[in-house]
């Protein structure tokens, strides 16, 4: 699978003003940090520190962040860890909120209704979410 390398950090729709740096280039303190699990662990080893938020990036067809990995990121950075799903071109598909009860998706979600949850999220935000059970594969229709 060929993935587009990100040149700029992701802007989370629920935190658009949060300054986020790419884990691959961060070597010191920053407000927010984004990257794959591997990039984030390397960044922590290189001295990167996030003060507010970690955005763990995922791509379709790759394993979703496990609870063990989420706990490891929490231990490394001591800030909330939210999952963000990108397509192979690096475009935002779905994103986790602080309730961590599924991934919120936009109106152009590439998934069928059988994997989307329409009930309100615990965070109070409206809209469809990718069901937690469906996050294991994360493959659009």
Please report, for each region that a protein language model flagged, where it lies by residue.
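Active-site glycine/GP-rich loop and adjacent strand/helix microenvironment
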Residues: 1-141
């Amino acid at each position: 699978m060929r993935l587009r390398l990100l040149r700029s950090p992701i802007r989370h729709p629920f935190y658009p003003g949060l300054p986020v740096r790419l884990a691959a280039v961060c070597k010191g303190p920053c407000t927010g940090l984004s990257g794959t699990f591997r990039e984030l662990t390397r960044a922590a080893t290189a001295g990167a520190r996030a003060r507010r938020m970690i955005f763990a990036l995922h791509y379709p067809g790759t394993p979703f962040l496990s609870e063990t990995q989420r706990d490891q990121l929490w231990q490394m950075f001591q800030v909330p860890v939210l999952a963000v799903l990108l397509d192979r071109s690096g475009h935002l598909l779905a994103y986790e909120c602080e309730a961590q009860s599924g991934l919120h998706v936009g109106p152009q979600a590439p998934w069928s209704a059988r994997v989307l949850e329409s009930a309100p999220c615990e965070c109070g935000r409206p809209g469809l979410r990718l069901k937690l059970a469906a996050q294991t594969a994360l493959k659009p229709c």
